[in-house]
Amino acid sequence: MSILLLNPIKWNDYALLDSGEGKKLERFGPYLFSRPEPQAFWSKRLPNEVWSKVAGTFLPSSSLDDNETSGKWLIKSNVLDRWEMSYDNIKFFSTPTPFRHLGFFPDQSPHWDWAAKKITNFIYNSNTETPPKILNLFGYSGLASLHAASNGASVTHIDASKKAINFAFENRDL
């Protein structure tokens, strides 16, 4: 049995640069961030001087002395609260959240591309003027919805969090 490995290929504004010792080093737009990654139990590849250039480091709640239920970011003063990024043909905002991520999940982009291919094939092979309908439950900041819509789908975007819906609207309006 072979394992199917899906790699994000349309990123200009994001890159996984290194991982190891329980962390990952990533570039989000102009900034480098270090985040916990418990499954990265190997040694780091890049030297510490590269890792020391991060704009932000996430500290999980387990590493904090206080009784916070979520972790927190240590962010350098020159980092914007949020900044614009893009993937393929969509624009969106990135922002550090108290949940370890930066407003989206770049590792999900192969799934967006898969859906875009299915949407394009449906439109090309369909005998109808009606676009394919997509229901995106747990849509969060809207990147999967925006990508599907930009490829011709009619998308219903749902999330239980009002904050997430507002974030998705802001991304849509870019």
Task: Please tell me what each predicted stretch does.
Residues L5-L6, I75, I123, H147:
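Compositionally biased amphipathic helical and low-complexity segments enriched in hydrophobic
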Residues K117-L174:
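Conserved SAM/SAH cofactor-binding pocket of Class I
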Residues L32, F41-K44, N48-V50, Q108-P110, ...:
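Generic preference for flexible, low-structure residues
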Residues P106-D113, K117, N166:
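Short, contiguous clusters of charged residues that form electrostatic/catalytic patches at enzyme active sites
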Residues W11-E26, F33-P106, D113:
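Non-catalytic substrate-recognition/targeting regions of SAM-dependent transferases
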Residues M1-A15:
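Short, Gly/Pro- and small/polar-rich lid/capping loops
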Residues F28-G29, L137:
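Single, functionally critical "micro-switch" positions that shape active/binding sites
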